[in-house]
């Protein structure tokens, strides 16, 4: 991560940290870096979610892009994966999404996609950051016919919706409850599932600029759970603010998280011989029950650091086509180059339809182990070196010996805060509490700030 770019673009409180001035510079410098080798006039797609700050940042960003001669196609409100899809299929130079994903309305973010539809590589982000920190803006300043042009492109939404529908199957006879988080999915999910002939019930579909992710969406699925039970829906589907992740709800109202969704889709693909290298890519945070279910099914796994960008990097480098995170980011590389909540939802419904099984039946093959996570405040200088402290290393080894393979411990530093995260999974809540609390006590004693 750089000074401005985190693991998912540039984020901050809108108009305070992520200002119009910064958005203009990101448009100008980002557009230049991503299009400097183009032989024809570069084309860049720009979309946003439903936050009140979106139009302000969109206007500033577009002004920056136009100032370096770029032809901008304004998509309006669209899911993040829709930008990625359109960049690839319409052969654009780049795409930009204005969103802070599952964060509250006061935040916003800007993330770039290259002409291949993937998020930027570290070296591209560093090149943009170098221009942001340069003492003087020395980029070209074209005038007259050298300036960029702006094209409103509402048909981009229709093209993305049609693409989604082509990946699915007829859902006649199925009732689907949707929670579009008052976000980007609110302009598309209803139409897509109606086109697939599902009966639908929808909440979180009335964005007002301030209510994105507010008590709704993938991080707050409680209302969706109630809607599923009230309507007798076959499944519920909750997206986040920019619709790049999905959390599902089965017909009994129980949550089906990203681990279980990946397993269900992965098993289906594996049985059809369509799971590349018979492998699913996941992160260190995936539940032990997920790993055991994969082992039982004979499916391999590749494990990365936390963050969908690391999952995608591993998928690209090794030729895998399915990966994701417990949080609901699922990447199905056969269809798109980034996490796509609506695409994942369609594939999940397709598995249900083609197998004739309920979501609870499909999800029951993964027994989720109780999990507990404790954050301990430590000095930044120590969080990366915690495992070098003998007492900490010894207590972790002791707890792992006691687990005898029927549990899991993960101790890792936070990527953004002076915290050490202690996580454990075990068959019972009591065992999880014991393992986490025992390790956490030693960490606090040895290197904790509050000790």
Swiss-Prot record:
One of the record's GO cellular component terms: cytosol
Modified residues (Phosphoserine): 101
Keywords: Isomerase, Magnesium, Metal-binding, Phosphoprotein
MF GO annotations: magnesium ion binding; phosphoglucosamine mutase activity; phosphomannomutase activity
Enzyme Commission no: 5.4.2.10
Cofactor note: Binds 1 Mg(2+) ion per subunit.
Keyword Phosphoprotein: yes
Residues that coordinate or bind Mg(2+): 101, 240, 242, 244
Catalytic reaction list: alpha-D-glucosamine 1-phosphate = D-glucosamine 6-phosphate
Coiled coil: none
Protein's GO biological process: carbohydrate metabolic process; peptidoglycan biosynthetic process; UDP-N-acetylglucosamine biosynthetic process
PTM section of the record: Activated by phosphorylation.
Family stated for the protein in its record: Belongs to the phosphohexose mutase family.
The protein's name: Phosphoglucosamine mutase
Name of the gene: glmM
């Amino acid at each position: 991560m750089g000074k401005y770019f985190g693991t998912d673009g540039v984020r901050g409180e809108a108009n305070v940290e992520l200002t119009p001035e910064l958005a203009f510079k990101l448009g100008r410098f980002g557009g230049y870096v991503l299009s400097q080798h183009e032989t024809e006039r570069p084309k860049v797609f720009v979309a946003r979610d439903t936050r009140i700050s979106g139009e302000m940042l969109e206007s500033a960003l577009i002004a920056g892009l136009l100032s370096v001669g770029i032809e901008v196609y304004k998509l309006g409100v669209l899911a993040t994966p829709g930008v990625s899809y359109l960049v690839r299929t319409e052969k654009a130079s780049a795409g930009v999404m204005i969103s802070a994903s599952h964060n509250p309305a006061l935040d916003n973010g800007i993330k770039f996609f290259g002409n291949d539809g993937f998020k930027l590589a570290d070296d591209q982000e560093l090149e943009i950051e170098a221009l942001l920190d340069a003492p003087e803006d020395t980029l070209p300043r074209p005038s007259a016919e050298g300036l960029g042009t702006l094209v409103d492109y509402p048909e981009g939404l229709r093209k993305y919706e049609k693409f989604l529908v082509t990946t699915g199957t007829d859902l006649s006879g199925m009732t689907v409850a949707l929670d579009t988080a008052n976000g980007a999915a609110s302009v598309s999910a209803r139409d897509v599932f109606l086109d697939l002939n599902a009966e639908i019930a929808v909440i979180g579909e009335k964005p007002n600029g301030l209510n994105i992710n507010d008590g709704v969406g993938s991080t707050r699925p409680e209302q969706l759970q109630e809607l599923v039970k009230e309507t007798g829906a076959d499944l519920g589907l909750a997206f986040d603010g920019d619709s790049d992740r999905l959390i599902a709800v089965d017909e009994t109202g129980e949550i089906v998280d990203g681990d279980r969704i990946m397993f269900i889709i992965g098993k289906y693909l594996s049985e059809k011989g369509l799971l590349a290298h018979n492998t699913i890519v996941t992160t260190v945070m995936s539940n032990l029950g997920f790993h055991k279910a994969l082992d039982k099914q004979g499916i391999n796994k590749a494990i990365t650091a936390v963050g969908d960008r690391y999952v995608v990097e591993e998928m690209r480098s090794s030729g895998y086509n399915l990966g994701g995170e417990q949080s609901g980011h699922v990447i199905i590389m056969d269809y798109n180059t980034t996490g796509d909540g609506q695409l994942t939802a369609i594939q999940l419904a397709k598995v249900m339809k083609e197998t004739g099984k309920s979501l609870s039946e499909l999800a029951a093959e993964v027994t989720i182990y109780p999990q507990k996570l404790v954050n301990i405040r430590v000095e930044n200088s120590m969080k990366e070196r915690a495992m070098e402290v003998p007492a900490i290393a010894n207590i972790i080894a002791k707890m792992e010996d006691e687990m005898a393979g029927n549990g899991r411990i993960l101790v890792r530093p936070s990527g953004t805060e002076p915290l050490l995260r202690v996580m454990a999974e075990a068959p019972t809540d009591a065992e999880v509490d014991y393992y986490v609390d025992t390790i956490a006590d030693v960490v606090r004693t040895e290197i904790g700030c509050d000790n």
